[in-house]
Design a protein with these regions (language model features):
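Selective transmembrane helix interface/packing segments
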Residues: 1-84
Length: 84
């Protein structure tokens, strides 16, 4: 059971990281996020980024919550890899 969870997380974490990178890029291309790709990426990443945004608000026009989410996912990935 533990190996299955480690394998699942080792696949899920990079996918979430790519989705967050996609969200960052889409925020520059389509700030309103009205197309379907932007909405899907936002729905995937908001459960991770939303709580961070509540703890650390934007500074001016800069939202650092995606970067913090990437940092935390990276730490989680290191923990998962060391457990496996």
């Amino acid at each position: 059971m533990g190996d299955l969870l480690i394998r699942f997380l080792s696949i899920l974490i990079p996918i979430l990281e790519l989705a967050i990178f996609g969200r960052i890029i889409m925020s520059w291309i389509d700030p309103g996020g009205q197309n379907s790709v932007s909405r899907i990426i936002r729905e995937i990443t908001e459960p991770i980024i939303g709580p961070i945004r509540k703890l650390i608000p934007s500074v001016g026009m800069f939202d650092f919550s995606p970067l913090i989410a990437l940092f935390l996912l990276n730490i989680l990935q290191q923990v998962v890899l060391s457990a496996g």
